[in-house]
Amino acid sequence: SASRSQIARELGLSFPTVGRLIDELCSDGELTEQGAGSSTGGRCACIYELNPLFSLYLLVQVESDRVCWNLKDLRENTVEQGCLPFEILSLEQLDALILDIHHRYPRLKAAAAGIAALVNHGVVEETNQYIGLKGLNLEEHFRRLVPIPMTVGNDMNFLTMGCWAQKHPDAGSLVTLFMGGNGIGGGMVINGRLWTGASGYCSEVGFLPVYERLNKGSLGLPPAEHISELYARLIQIYAVTVNPHMMVLYRHPLLEGRLDEIRRLCASYLPSKAIPSIELSYDYQQDYEKGLFTVAKSMGQAVSEGGL
């Protein structure tokens, strides 16, 4: 929040110019008056701040048996949220959800959707679960459906971006691993930038021979007795290919009490200086939402500035 004179000083603009700009923004609803500020002897100046409800962002998470959404304002406060269960996910179900929210919230600026599938530039290329979406360019489809920028990507990429933004902005590189109903997925940030590879296959650990061997060829969760070795071997692979500063393992019941064992196994597979810091995180949902919000907000602001 700031007064007209404070804004003028900060922007280096004349007081009349700032006054006209503020009047226009207040008329549009982007700025709101917050009363008078403190006085140093003269008349108290009116204070203005951004209206958090002027810009809304839709975050969509496509889960194994439901689609969950969270509509957030500029301050990341939840305006509306909910879940839609499904047996077989169809494009029509996603269309109906997005159209409904866009119709009811005309100040929706952008949307981001995460899905547990291999997604490359908006195209669902590999999925064992959402067969009706395979091969579709969801980004192009949704941008024709509603006149707002919308991106669709792999859930682990959004999760990793959120993890980086929330906790580890100073780390040079970061790798995340999450074990869900369809197995283990990974994500990678190098020098502050998400790295997905030439065609989006980076961190698709399910294609690794060690994963298939220790998972007994299953598409679901690995056997409990192989959990520690599987995680340690994955960390070993990342260490010799990327050499990250930090590995973040997201909490799962099968991981409980195994972190020390994973570290011991890593010490037997790698020299000490190659072992990254290994952290267990309980913040899956917070990090996932943070990643979705960060991307959606960035797209919305780019449109406002004429960049998209």
Predicted regions and their residues:
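Short glycine-rich anion-binding loops that position phosphate/pyrophosphate groups of nucleotides
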Residues: 116-118, 182-183, 253-254
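Short, ordered coil/turn segments that flank beta-strands lining enzyme active or ligand-binding pockets
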Residues: 74-75, 120, 190-191
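ATP-binding/phosphotransfer module of carbohydrate and carboxylate kinases, centering on a glycine-rich
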Residues: 1-34, 40-43, 47-83, 89-100, ...
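Short glycine-aspartate micro-motif
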Residues: 57-61, 110-112, 174-178, 185
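Hydrophobic "anchor" residues
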Residues: 78, 124, 194-195
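Short clusters of small/polar residues that mark proteolytic maturation junctions
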Residues: 7, 83, 129, 199-200
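Glycine/GP-enriched mid-protein hinge/lid loop-to-helix segment characteristic of carbohydrate kinases
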Residues: 149-240
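Glycine-rich phosphate-binding loop and adjoining helix at the ATP-binding site
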Residues: 81-83, 87-166, 171, 259-269
